[in-house]
Each structure stands twice: as structure tokens, then as C-alpha cells.
């Protein structure tokens, strides 16, 4: 099997792709002369400096300097490897990149791709039919009137391709049969339910239909809202019914409206997170077009990872009732534990949901609330912790204050902490000094617990009992120097990368990460190259994939480590922290060497600049160690 995509294949894919069409899915482009201009997605700017040359099929930002081909753009914006970017472009152009081939082939050549494309066509036809029924037929009039009464416009219904599934249970199946569509696709599509006699009934009936799209805008599933009428009360039916999971649709990875909102999210570096589809649509109609919603379930790590590729800030805008407040608190906890997002909250007043708020107060009021009514996580927590306490009781007041001080240990900004300490002191007639003492005590306890956990971690994970070294070749040196703490951390992290896809995804989202030692960095590059060629990671196969004997031996030693079967998020964070400290220390040493050379040749300006850089790095190193 070839180990990389042949150059002629790369060129063929590029020649059959228009870079403007691809980049236009991420950046709003406007024609300017012979090129297209837009706001750069890689740095903040107010005037466009990002240029796409259609004739040359390249892009360049005159502000930050980034540029390249369509593959380089996707590598940068989606955080993927070069082979993955080639495959990504090929998918968008309906070509399949196979590492064994020498010419591009149409997606239909493989059974899996053929079925996927056929299922996408089936969903597209269903969406078109449902939409036609809603806007053009008498059967759809009650549903259309309901939506118009809810404040939706015809334009909005078109934008979201909202439709209606009639009450007749075999409506869609009969239409598809009349069109002689492949009935073997009915069951895996999720659009139908098969009866005992082998015939098919429509899964969705008497429902307003919301198409659910993948990031490229293809319909992959539906969510149907029950439409109750006098002759169809539907009392025992669920209000919302979603498609089951299929080869197209994984609800843990899917976000409603992500395909439409992505450009705006990229532009603002911010995403608004809603609970329901109607909330997203109402926000869109109000001019807030960076909203998405999870699929009727709590937010998932897979959805968080998708959002991390396009945004730096998440604004949680859930319902204002008690259930919505509880869901907001859970989302905060999940996001704080599994991401590095800046978080803020929009609390909807009067226990309304966003859709109700828009209908009651109008689009302008909601837009103002969404843009200017955001509160910090701590401000939300202040209100949240009141819900379960009797604030007229002195003991519960003190418990409340202690709970807030614990929450305050998660606030990094000194200004924000100072403001809230003064606010708490004023409300409960306490001295700021006493609150600071209590806060510092809690902070010290927190650091002590973290330090103990890290020490236990290194005892349990970083220093496993000695094992017999596998013999690989005759000149293998048995008496090696003891590994340093950094080397142990690097080996443990590589072990996790070999065994856990989630850890690989985490590292891929850290563009500035690198191993401290070249041999481990090289192995990591080879590991990533292997992963792009294989759907699953097999240690033995990976060893065979490696060409250099020393690298193979290193991989074997790492694979033989006696570590737990599954890592924790804390373990991975600790490993990254140890490696990062080493990288800073190494950078300081390199700067010192450069400084001595500048001094030797009499370059005083460079010497002074390097001195300042060394000071900054030393402060950074000290801060990191203090945090530890």
C-alpha cells in the first residue's frame, strides 16, 4: 500500500476544485477586481485584508501573512493534516481520495460511498417534498398558518426549508415507490418504520418538519414537531420526534444550524448555544445568526470539539425557567471541564424561552439582550446558588457566601475577583479583608489538593514498576540512563496517543504544542501520518508502518508501558503541563545562547531585546510553576 497520496492525485483534486467555493463556506467573500476579499478568519480585523485569487487558486492575508492553497486553508481553519485536507476537498467535490489509487474516482465506485450518496439524495428529496407540502398545498395550510402565527416569515421558512409531513402514514413511502427509488434504502434511512409484513410506514406524520444538516449543508435527518388539530389531538404522541441515528446522522456530533451559522461564528469568534430549534430560528430572524442547538440532549464532548474549531467564546442562552437554569449550570460545568472557551450567559427574564421572548418583546429587544445582556459565569452562579437556600436564614447565608468563594477560585481575572468580593461584602455586611482571608484559605486548600493529586498521579502513572525490556536487535543498549520527569511525561502522552483517539483529537486542537525532545516529536509526526491512513489504530500495524529501527524500538518501549487502560482529563492536562514547562526552560537556554552571541559581536540592540525576552519567559516559567 502506498504511504502517501500520489502527487498527481493531489494535483487532480486541486484542479477540479474552485478555491472560492470552498473558502466561501467559511468566509464571506466579495468580488474586488479580479480577486475576492473578506475579513480574515485567522486574526481580528475591521477592514478586509484576506484575498482569494480565483485565477491562481490561492489565498493570502495581507494582515497576518497566512496563505497557500485550498488544502492549506482547510488545514489551518479545521486543524487537520494535509492528507485529511485533500480528502476533505475531494469529498466536497464528490471525489474519493484512496491511498492505493492513481486517478480520482467518483464517490459511487465504492458500496459505502454509493449508499451514503443515495441516502443523502433520499433525505434531500424528502425535505423538498415536505417543504412543498407546507407552502404549496391545502394539506399544509394549518401547519403554515401555525408557523406564521408564531411569527415566522415566508423567507425564514424558505431559509430553514421547514416542511410538513401529512397525517397519511404511507405518504412518503408511496411517493418514493412511485418514483421507483431503491427500497433497500428505506430502513437504513431512518425515514420509515418497517412492519412485520415487510411494508414500510412513514416515521414522521402530522408533524412540522425541521431538516437537520451536516456541516456541508446536506440534509441528514429530521426533527418533527407534532401539530395538534381538532381531528388529530395526538395526546399520547411526543411533542418532538427526531430521526434515529444512521450512517449519516450521529446526534452526539450534530448541531442544528451549524452549517448556516459557521460563517458568522467565525466572523465573531462567538457561538450562541440554545436549547431548541425554534429558539435558534427566532434568534436568526432577530439578526442573531451565530446560534446553534444540540439535538434534544445535553451538550456533548463531540459537539464541544466541533465548536472549538470555529469559536473562542460560547454564550449560553437557554430557557429562563428552572429546567433551563439547571441545564445552563450543567453546560457550564461541562464546558469548563472539557474546553478552553470564554463563557458568558444570557439569562432570559420572566422564565421565558428565547422564542417566547422574541414573540413578546420583538426582534430588536432580543438582539439587544443577546449582544449586551451577557453576564459572567460567576454572576450566574450567584443567582443559581440562591435557588436552593433560604436567604433569610443566617447559617444559609454563610453557606452561600462560602459557596461563592469556592466558585470565585475559578475566576482568573483579579479585577473581576475584586469586584465580586466587594459586592459580597456589601450585601452581607462583611469586611472585604475577612472575605479575602477566607478566599485565600480556600485557594490554598485547592492548590494543596491539586498538588497531592499530581503527586499521586506521578507515583501511580509516571513511575511504573520496572519491566523486562523487549529485545529488538543485538546492539540494543540495555543499560540506559534514567528517564527524566519530562521524558516520562512524553512517553506517557505518546502511549495515550497510540491508544485513545480522544487524546489525539485533543492534541490536534493545540496548534502550538510540540514535544520537548526531537525523537518524541518525530514519533508523534509518524503517528499522525499513520492515523491519516487508517480508520483505527493498531499498535502492531503501526510498528510495521515505521521504517527506522530505532524509532520502532522507541515505539515498542512506549507501547509496553504499564499504564491504566484509559486516561483521565486531569492526567492528560498534567502531562501537557510538564512538557510545556520544559519547552519554556529550553527556550530560555536558547535565548541565552543567542544573547551571548549578540554580546560577542557587539549588537547591543539585539542583546537588549533578547534580555527582555528572557525575562518574559522566566516570568512565564515562574507563573507556571507557581500554578503547579
Swiss-Prot record:
Transcription regulation found in the keyword field: no
Entry's cofactor comment: Binds 1 zinc ion per monomer.
Catalytic activity entry: ssDNA + n NTP = ssDNA/pppN(pN)n-1 hybrid + (n-1) diphosphate
GO cellular component, one term: primosome complex
NCBIfam families referenced in this protein's UniProt entry, alphabetically: dnaG
HAMAP family in UniProt: DNA_primase_DnaG
Protein name, UniProt field: DNA primase
Gene name tied to this protein: dnaG
Amino acid at each position: 500500500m502506498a504511504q502517501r497520496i500520489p502527487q498527481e492525485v493531489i494535483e487532480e483534486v486541486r484542479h477540479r476544485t474552485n478555491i472560492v467555493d470552498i473558502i466561501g463556506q467559511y468566509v464571506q467573500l466579495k468580488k474586488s477586481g479580479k480577486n475576492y476579499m473578506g475579513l480574515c478568519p485567522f486574526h481580528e480585523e475591521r477592514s478586509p485584508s484576506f484575498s482569494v485569487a480565483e485565477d491562481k487558486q490561492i489565498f493570502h492575508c495581507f494582515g497576518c501573512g497566512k496563505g497557500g492553497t485550498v488544502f492549506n486553508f482547510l488545514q489551518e481553519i479545521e486543524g487537520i493534516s494535509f492528507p485529511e485536507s485533500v480528502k476533505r476537498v475531494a469529498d466536497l467535490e464528490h471525489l474519493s481520495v484512496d491511498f492505493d489509487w492513481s486517478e480520482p474516482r467518483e464517490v459511487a465506485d465504492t458500496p459505502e460511498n454509493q449508499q451514503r450518496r443515495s441516502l443523502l439524495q433520499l433525505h434531500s428529496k424528502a425535505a423538498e417534498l415536505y417543504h412543498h407540502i407546507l407552502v404549496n398545498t391545502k394539506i399544509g395550510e394549518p401547519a403554515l398558518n401555525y408557523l406564521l402565527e408564531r411569527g415566522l416569515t415566508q423567507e425564514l421558512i424558505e431559509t430553514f426549508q421547514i416542511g410538513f409531513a401529512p397525517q397519511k402514514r404511507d405518504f412518503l413511502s408511496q411517493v418514493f415507490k412511485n418514483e421507483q427509488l431503491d427500497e433497500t434504502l428505506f430502513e437504513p434511512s431512518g425515514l420509515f418504520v418497517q412492519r412485520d409484513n415487510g411494508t414500510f410506514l412513514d416515521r414522521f406524520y402530522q408533524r412540522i418538519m425541521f431538516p437537520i444538516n451536516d456541516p456541508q449543508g446536506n440534509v441528514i435527518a429530521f426533527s418533527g414537531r407534532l401539530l395538534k388539530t381538532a381531528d388529530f389531538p395526538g395526546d399520547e404522541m411526543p411533542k418532538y420526534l427526531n430521526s434515529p441515528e444512521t450512517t449519516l446522522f450521529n446526534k452526539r456530533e450534530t448541531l442544528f444550524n451549524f452549517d448556516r451559522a459557521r460563517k458568522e461564528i467565525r466572523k465573531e469568534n462567538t457561538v450562541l448555544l440554545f436549547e431548541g430549534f425554534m429558539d435558534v430560528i427566532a434568534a436568526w430572524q432577530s439578526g442573531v445568526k451565530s446560534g446553534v442547538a444540540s439535538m434534544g440532549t445535553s451538550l456533548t464532548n463531540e459537539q464541544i470539539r466541533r465548536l472549538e474549531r470555529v469559536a473562542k467564546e460560547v454564550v449560553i442562552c437557554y430557557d429562563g425557567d428552572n429546567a433551563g437554569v439547571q441545564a445552563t449550570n450543567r453546560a457550564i460545568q461541562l464546558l469548563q471541564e472539557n474546553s478552553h472557551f470564554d463563557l458568558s450567559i444570557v439569562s432570559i427574564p420572566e422564565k421565558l424561552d428565547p422564542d417566547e421572548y422574541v414573540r413578546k418583546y420583538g426582534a430588536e429587544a432580543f438582539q439587544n439582550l443577546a449582544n449586551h445582556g451577557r453576564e459572567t459565569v460567576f454572576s450566574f452562579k450567584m443567582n443559581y446558588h440562591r435557588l436552593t437556600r433560604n436567604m433569610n436564614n443566617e447559617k444559609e447565608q454563610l453557606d452561600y457566601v462560602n459557596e461563592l468563594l469556592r466558585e470565585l477560585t475559578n475566576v482568573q481575572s483579579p479585577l473581576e475577583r475584586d469586584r465580586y468580593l466587594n459586592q459580597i461584602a456589601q450585601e452581607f455586611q462583611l469586611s472585604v479583608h475577612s472575605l479575602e482571608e477566607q478566599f485565600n484559605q480556600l485557594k490554598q486548600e485547592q492548590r494543596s489538593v491539586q498538588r497531592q493529586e499530581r503527586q499521586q498521579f506521578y507515583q501511580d502513572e509516571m513511575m511504573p514498576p520496572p519491566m523486562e525490556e523487549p529485545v529488538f536487535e543485538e546492539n540494543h543498549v540495555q543499560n540506559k540512563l534514567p528517564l527524566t520527569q519530562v521524558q516520562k511525561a512524553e512517553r506517557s502522552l505518546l502511549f495515550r496517543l497510540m491508544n485513545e483517539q480522544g487524546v489525539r483529537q485533543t492534541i490536534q486542537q493545540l496548534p502550538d504544542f510540540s514535544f520537548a525532545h526531537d525523537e518524541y516529536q518525530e514519533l508523534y509526526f509518524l503517528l499522525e501520518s499513520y492515523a491519516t491512513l487508517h480508520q483505527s489504530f493498531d499498535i502492531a500495524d503501526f510498528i510495521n508502518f515505521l521504517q527506522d529501527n530505532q524509532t520502532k524500538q522507541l515505539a515498542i518501549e512506549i507501547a509496553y508501558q504499564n499504564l491504566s487502560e484509559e486516561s483521565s482529563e486531569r492526567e492528560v492536562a498534567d502531562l501537557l503541563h510538564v512538557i510545556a514547562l520544559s519547552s519554556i526552560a529550553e527556550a530560555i537556554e536558547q535565548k541565552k545562547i543567542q544573547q551571548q552571541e549578540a554580546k560577542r559581536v557587539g549588537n547591543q540592540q539585539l542583546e537588549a531585546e533578547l534580555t527582555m525576552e528572557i525575562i518574559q519567559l522566566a516570568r512565564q516559567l515562574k507563573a507556571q510553576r507557581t500554578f503547579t
